[in-house]
């Protein structure tokens, strides 16, 4: 796929790229696309030289040794600051995702002073891309908007779903029995995150230049609703 510009139709570009490389979109494919290209297509790119830091941003910048303008962008994307540490700000974003730096990304963005926040409404972005692909391919698909996140107690990052459309993102297995007849009580599998992580093995995080991947052969449960909350409720979150 070419470099993304504001106004580009991501769904159309994915459809065309898949066809060109000999792997056209098929029924029940899962399309995983990085949040950076989605935000770029939506014009959600910020030049730090055009940002005036607030007093709060200046204060946090001193604590974290971050660029005050970058901190200001993070604050604008933040509903709640969860924790401030050495060179890191853990936040709950305006779309309720808990992550470092509100998901504001410097990587794979042209211009030394440009950064890319998460899409304003990731689920809506996923829905729009899905509709574009389905219209062109005449195939039912699911779409995930992904981002790279760190995890408590674990080294290294993985991809997670920050937005989804067309399927149930969590498989609830409570009430099912295991091999020995034990009834599962808390087992809920984060399907969307697992698919996003699998796709990252192809997409990469550096200079691969692959903004989207097709996951083929997974038997997901189709669903038009987007009511499933992927973030744990604050009162049940042991880390907050």
Q: Where are these predicted regions, by residue range?
A:
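N-terminal and secondary-structure boundary signal
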Residues: 1-240
